[in-house]
Amino acid sequence: MKRILITAIILVAACLRSNAQVFILGDNVTTGRMSRIEGTVIDSLTNEAIPFASFYVIPAKDTTISNFTLTDAEGKAKLEDVPYGDYTLRVEMLGYKPFVKRKYFRDRVADMGTIKLQVDDKYLEAAVVTDVGNPIVVKKDTVEFNASSFQVGTNAMLKDLLKRMPGMEITDDGKVKFNGEAIDKLTVGGKTFFFDDQSTALNNLPATIVDKIRVIDRESERTRDTGLQDGNREKVLDVALKKEYEKGWFGNAGLKGGTTFAGGEDDPLKDDRGLLYSGNVLAAAYSEKDQVTLIGNGMNINDSNGVVFVVYGAGGDRTRISDFGAISSAAQFGANVNTSRIKNFDSTVGANYKYGDSRSGSKSFRTTFQEDGNILSSSESSSRGFSNSVSANGEFFKEKGKVRVRISPQFSYSRDNDFNNSNSNTTRDGALVNTSQSNVHALGTSKYATSFNSLNINDLWGKKNRVLGFTFDISHSDSEGETQENSLVKMRTKDESKSLKYLNDGRSSNVSGQILYGEPIGEKIIISTTARLAYNKNNSTRDAYDASGFNDYYSSESHLRGLSQSYNMTAQYKFTDKSWATLGASLNGDLSETWSKSFGIEETTGEGEWYWHVAPVLRIQHSFGNNRIGLNSSGFSQRPSQSSMLPVMNISNPARPTIGNIYLHPNGNTYFSANWHNNNREKFSTLMLTLYCNIDTRPVTYARWYDTDGILYSIPVNSRKNRVSGSVYTSYTTPLDGKARKWFLTVAIDGGIANSTSYQTKGTLPGINRETFDYSSFMESFWGDASGNRFYSGKSGFNESSTITITPSLYPSLRYTSGDFTGRINASFSKRIARYSLDPSLNMNTTDSSVGAYASYRTKHEFEFNTDLSYNWYNGYSAGYGAPEWQWNGEIAKSIKAFTLSVKIHDILDQTRNLTHTVTANYEEDTYSLVMGRYILFGLKWNFGKMNAANSQKAQNAAFRMAF
């Protein structure tokens, strides 16, 4: 019975391992007769060794690679434990013709001698870079990296491979940049991989399976579908798998554990949880038409950006639980399926379950500037949120032929449980004005569904470049839950306490459609027009309860109905395939009607009031040589959020209540951008220059005031003056050692200037009695008529203040990569300058500076050492904030066949802080937020499947010997 059971297990394992392969029991298995195949690979012209060439065998009458290796630095290769039999030996290297030989191996040692590879002239003619053995090939708008030319550890992941490639960068939030430009989409074999979550591929795809990395600069999705240039481009990083992994399966599993160990001081903004863990597993099966990927993660430390937790709210808003300043525990189970079995269609379906436990904390100090005496306030807050989410995504598209179709549905369900605690105190002239405490517990569920659909018909009725396109979007969300709010405010004259429970219910629906038509005039001109209509409806109720039961006074209800319409007409002239110009105009209209009831009073606003915004449309692109110049100008309108228009007072933070404004209007936005890209592919250098200007018409800002008890009130208002801003960004990346490309210098300069308007008081104003608050009476005194005549004239005590903010920054970086070593030295200098019209004596200057270094080294014995060190210092911050700090992290890893052992120490000196600085027209605030602090983490990772074919074969042979 035991032998039968073992035999069954072995047969199942063999089936999982093989794809188009038949497993035959023969004397080579039962007696252990194996061959060792050796060879040396050299260049046929120079007789120099060729390292990193693929050296593998395929059993006769089969298509699956059974044994695989790469040549070493001397061009030598060795395949161990090849069962006796008939095989095809293949040796391949980028830029060379493949070597192919069929042979029956039945010797203990089969020495293939010296194998000379011939240069493939046809392949090299397509590339700008033509050096023999060069790991980089550039053709048209694609940069291709040969993965075998970049040395990484045996069990390295995709992110480790990318870090060794010239121009590649992995950001702190798990995104990829190439030569300073963000990668918009990451695909595997040309297919979507877990939608927009790049970190899943970076942290889970083994580098061993990668054949090539391609960075593709292509036109936007809309341009590809319609043929009409929209001025946008996207950068795609495509991971091409080695042939032996295009069919079959592979995977990896990892586990890490450790603990926090902060210094002796008791710091509430340092993680004190103790035990830390992180585990993940990935399994993938690939065939010519299908890709199936399964992942699982569980962790309470996101040391690899492996999980991004997103929650969809009632309006479809996406919220990350792992925001900056939060410590998260998370679990994820997901599946992603790509298939091209439907003729002419590519399909992607994904499903995810995610759990999150997020903790955050902060400590802030704010100075509010007033003529009759500054107000100082300090606050501390802590929160914890639990969330469970289930989501499913789909993408079905056809990008070839005259008819293009795209359907993208999405569904999600989430349940949240949040706890928030805060306290604050306010002083003036050295005297305590008030203290406050509050705690909030919110429990809720939300359901969200949406679908984006498009249909484009090109060359309509047989006329080239005539296009007719339709898009249709629909979404719906439901949310419900309950909130318990408790608060206590102690003032000089009185104390106020509240204990209320709210039952919340929200419904939101959105429907929009667009039609596009393009008519060619001759071969170079296309006249196009679009019309878009959208309708949205938002209903929400908030029933309040106190110790006596239902409280109508604090209950509220609102119904919002919105309509928007947009019309666009342009003329596009095509100079060449890469140079064109588009001129036109757009007309946008918004209608927002709101019925609301709060404090026992009903209000209707915005009825029949359309807001119209006209903007020019300018899009120009001109390409010549290595240069591309683009100009872009357009505009849009945007309605205020529903919560900002509710006629209610939010007292969840009793020391800082907020009030909605039913008279808010939509704001318009007109922008202009210009960019110049110089991409010298021969030198591998990139120069980018971008200018951006923006004009906000009637932007939403805030009016804030303190009362004599130090309570800070806020209400959103439209500014009468436009907000004008501009920015410039330039980046230059170049190798310093010619074609060797080991040394890379990057210098980035960023600068911005903005002129904005806000409304503030010169001193205190009367407070609001929350027990007798009447919204209509308050707005009549504060706002006046519907146009805001009292507020804008200054009769309610507010003055118009203009603020000019200037933000210059400099980011130099020097990187060195050679074989097993990668190093980087970088610095950053950011300055914020604020100038105020009401009181120039309050003008401010702050500076954030940082210098740092990073190094990674891998030894021939598969040890890998990684460390980074930085020093940060600050100027212009409040007392007690902005202390300089050292940040030092280190990691050691050791690969042993299919396993990797690692130990990582984060924040070795225990000095890391999370500091933010906020400057507005009338206050300055410094905030420290919760950070992980110092911790140690031990890890074990195992790669399984095809990538360890020889080891898997050994295990199977041993099992068969035990069974028989």
Where are these regions (language model features)?
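Short, ordered, surface-exposed loop/turn motifs in non-cytosolic proteins
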Residues: 37, 45-60, 136-138
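Outer membrane beta-barrel strand-and-loop segments of large Gram-negative receptors
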Residues: 378-380, 512, 554-556, 566, ...
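Outer-membrane beta-barrel translocator domains and adjoining extracellular loop/strand segments
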Residues: 226-227, 264-268, 296, 305-313, ...
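A short, solvent-exposed loop/turn motif at the edges and junctions
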Residues: 59-64, 86-102
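Signature of Gram-negative outer-membrane beta-barrel scaffolds
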Residues: 526-623, 836-837, 842
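Short Pro-Gly-centered beta-turn/loop motif in secreted/extracellular proteins
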Residues: 51, 78-86, 94
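Short, acidic Ser/Thr/Gly-rich low-complexity loop/linker segments typical of extracellular
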Residues: 60-76
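Membrane-proximal, glycine/serine-rich, low-complexity loop/turn segments characteristic
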Residues: 20-34, 74-76, 90, 97-99, ...
